[in-house]
């Protein structure tokens, strides 16, 4: 088993609906560790950098508009195979198709307003982490 870190972001719809505690609770109950967490509003510049892999896709503008529409809660989650474990916990991108029991399956009916974002690979985590956090914000415990 490989200990990894991954990024998990509660998007503006999740914050607005009061689901921060639910997301944190699921992470903790799974046995993963939160080693950094903060609430913030992403600037357009940060949002464009964060979603840069989607820059050439038709939904890029809408994605940036949505993620900057309200506060988000970003956290760094650590644990065995954290990237794949968290991806399984959040479910399919489209909340209408996400399995019951997943965060999106339980709380989302949309592909954009789908409560959370999570890194899809260790490489994505490294890129996304640098946009939202600095190493000094990691708390080892």
Curated annotation (Swiss-Prot):
| Family of this protein | Belongs to the NDK family.
Protein name as it appears in the record: Nucleoside diphosphate kinase
Q: Where exactly are the transmembrane stretches of this chain? A: none
Question: Whose protein is this, by species?
Answer: Aeropyrum pernix (strain ATCC 700893 / DSM 11879 / JCM 9820 / NBRC 100138 / K1)
Q: Which residues hold ATP?
A: 11, 59, 87, 93, 104, 114
| Pfam families named among the record's database cross-references | NDK
Principal localization reads cytoplasm
Q: Which cofactor does it need?
A: Mg(2+)
Compartment annotation: Cytoplasm
UniProt cross-references to SUPFAM superfamilies, sorted A to Z: Nucleoside diphosphate kinase, NDK
Instruction: Please list the GO terms describing molecular function.
Output: ATP binding; metal ion binding; nucleoside diphosphate kinase activity
GO biological process terms, semicolon-separated? CTP biosynthetic process; GTP biosynthetic process; UTP biosynthetic process
What reaction gets catalysed by this protein? a 2'-deoxyribonucleoside 5'-diphosphate + ATP = a 2'-deoxyribonucleoside 5'-triphosphate + ADP; a ribonucleoside 5'-diphosphate + ATP = a ribonucleoside 5'-triphosphate + ADP
Could you name the active-site residues? Answer: 117
Keyword terms of this UniProt record? ATP-binding, Cytoplasm, Kinase, Magnesium, Metal-binding, Nucleotide metabolism, Nucleotide-binding, Phosphoprotein, Transferase
The protein's matches in SMART domains, at most eight in alphabetical order, are given as:
NDK
Q: Which domain of life is it from?
A: Archaea
List the record's Gene Ontology CC terms alphabetically. Answer: cytoplasm
- Give the function comment from the record: Major role in the synthesis of nucleoside triphosphates other than ATP. The ATP gamma phosphate is transferred to the NDP beta phosphate via a ping-pong mechanism, using a phosphorylated active-site intermediate.
Signal peptide positions on this chain: none
Write the Enzyme Commission number(s) for this entry.
2.7.4.6
Q: Does the keyword Cytoplasm apply?
A: yes
Q: Which InterPro entries match?
A: NDK-like_dom (IPR034907), NDK-like_dom_sf (IPR036850), Nucleoside_diP_kinase (IPR001564), Nucleoside_diP_kinase_AS (IPR023005)
């Amino acid at each position: 088993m490989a200990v990894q870190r991954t990024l998990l972001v509660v998007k503006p719809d999740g914050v607005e609906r009061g689901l921060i505690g639910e997301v944190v609770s699921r992470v903790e109950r799974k046995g993963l560790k939160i080693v950094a967490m903060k609430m913030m509003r992403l600037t357009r510049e940060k949002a464009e950098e964060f979603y840069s892999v989607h820059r050439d896709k038709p939904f890029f503008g809408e994605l940036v508009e949505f993620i900057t529409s309200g506060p988000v809660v970003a956290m760094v989650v650590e644990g065995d195979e954290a990237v794949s474990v968290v991806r399984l916990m959040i479910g399919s991108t489209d909340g209408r198709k996400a399995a019951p029991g997943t965060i999106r399956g339980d709380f989302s009916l949309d592909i954009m307003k789908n409560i959370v974002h999570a890194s899809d690979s260790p490489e994505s985590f490294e890129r996304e982490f640098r946009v939202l956090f600095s190493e000094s914000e990691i708390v080892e415990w």
